[in-house]
Amino acid sequence: MVVGTLAVLLAAGMTMAVAAQAAVSCRVAYAVSAQRPGGFTANVTVTNLGDPVDGWKLSWAFPSGQQVTQAWNATITSSGARVTAANASYNAAIAANGTVSFGFNGSWSGSNTAPAAFTLNGVTCSGGTGASPSPSPSPSASPSPSASPSRSPSPSPSASPSSSPSPSPQPGDAMATVAAMQPGWNLGNTFDAIPDETSWGNPPTTQALLHHVRSQGFKSIRIPVTWSNHHGPAPDYTIDAAWLNRIRQVVDWSLAEGFYVMINLHHDSWQWINGYPGDRTTVMNRYTALWRQIAGTFRDHSPKPVFESINEPQFTGTSGDDENYQVLNELNTEFVHLVRESGGGNATRLLVLPTLNTNADQGRLDALMTTFNQLRDPNLAATVHFYGWWPFSVNIAGGTRYDTNVEQDLVGSFDRVYNTFVSHGIPVIIGEWALLNYDHTRPGSIERGEFLKFIEAVGYHARIRKLTTMLWDAGQFLNRNELRWRDQGIYDLMKSSWTTRSGTASSDQVYVPRSGAITSKTLTLNLNGTTFQGLRQGDTSLAEGADYTVSGDTLTLTAAALTRPAGNRAYGVNATIEARFSQGAPWPIGIIASDPPTQAAATGTTSSFAIPTQFHGDQLATMEARYADGSPAGPANWTTYKQFWDHFQPDYNANSIILKPDFFAEVKDGRVTLTFHFWSGAKTTYYITRSGTTVTGGTS
């Protein structure tokens, strides 16, 4: 199958939640926008060709055993091959001739054949307009989310936990042990790298690195380990002595620094453990052989080494979620029994069990809770991973800001794990968290201020729910060669979030014209329970009244306050002022001089095409692509907004915007209109025409 070019267009009859005999018809477009070994991303668009709809469920059967692992803009459940996507609270209504879209990540093995048919609200796709069966009552409408998510109160857990320091845990006290592990840090892309420690670009781990991480306030370290390439054949699967000794060395170094240390079977999950449903004996023998050796190595260590059974467990060849839950239960249960039977410190060591795909959907959580209820072991913890609302995490579909979608996804995920586990005495470790596209090698993919708001919210919402968080750092946060943070301000706010809230604002940027009069600008303050204390530039406090005013949560910067730090108004950031609050980290506000960006004609190919762009101090936020009929062009054809960096990227040094081969791989011959959105609010329109592998572009 050619990725991204497959679309299934089907007409369906719809049941209506508002009328028993409504005329209904719809069209469904299913497209795979990205495919990788064992995984894929799909997008689904439903066009309502009949009467308005309020409340919908779209169902289909996967013909090749595919499984959904993560969804957005819909709640997806599965039973065997059958999959059902139900509306979110905010997209239940589909107007006549309106559309609704959702997407998901999934797993596949062998082939990734598209579904052959869909049903909507129980009606088989028929291609015509017909009367729906008698509907079920319409669900209650959900209240509209607030427009300012960072100021909205979170849905409270059943009891607000104390913010006082946790006492020293005693052996066998799982809740106290996990609390003592907060905050945690991942030694990512190191021992999980394939095949060796430095294969993915990070330097060898040193005692100096571990000492530095500990000095920055982290109390636990997760050391992901991939064992696949470091053991012998069946039946013993003997781990290479040098590899096991190196793992033990780094664990011991970490313990000497005072860390709790979590180790696991990492990329083994998709390299061979995923085949367990089809070859239970071979996979289980290998799995138990490895854990028997690992458990034996650390049997007599202190309670601070912690074992995690499997990273992001996933399976192929199953009939659906119910079977996935069962096989994961078997592996988790065998892991617990094996470690406990090894004796010594392992008899009471904290063991960490993941949900399916380490996903926080309620079905995954409930399945793992069943395992906990069966095991009745007091020294267990649950783990999930959190990378935020997917469009924001990768900057696609216009997901450029920390908005209500992002906030609701965060709060919903953390509430579910709190209510399922923590409120019942089972501790939870967010074993990995970050944003997927935030990386020092992809500058601008995630706007800095929006990421700061995400960091602040993760820290707060995890803290009040007693969740321990472990930052996924594959080198994008800490420069391991120089032992310094790549962005000190990001670390400072993260550290502050471990103990208190910080105020933020609607933006960390204020744009002023390169020439011409500067006028006053306003920002909305997100106080987050703090009080605003004033503005500073360096060591100088700005004067209330002359330099700024505050009315409610509206901060107004006067023309004089902006003119002075802007200086000669060179393109770009001319100065940074800070908003200070009664607690937490200050909020940076960059004063940026810019003019509207301009672009010029270009020629190239589908493998090499760059648009000459004079940015004039501005920064690119996102790009839209449309065909002449207004439909989305290029990959992810469920949205006009393309994915930052994967489909396009700015090159500020070369004064160009690069359109990637992955973008052109799914662009049809003909004319495409591109709209570039910049953080100042400016937009440019550019036209490209593809003919085979030749591409021409211009502003008209």
Each PLM stretch: what is its role?
Residues 1-7, 16-17:
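N-terminal export and membrane-targeting signals
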Residues 441-540, 570-576, 580-583, 588, ...:
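Aromatic-rich peripheral "rim/lid" segments of glycoside hydrolase catalytic domains that contact
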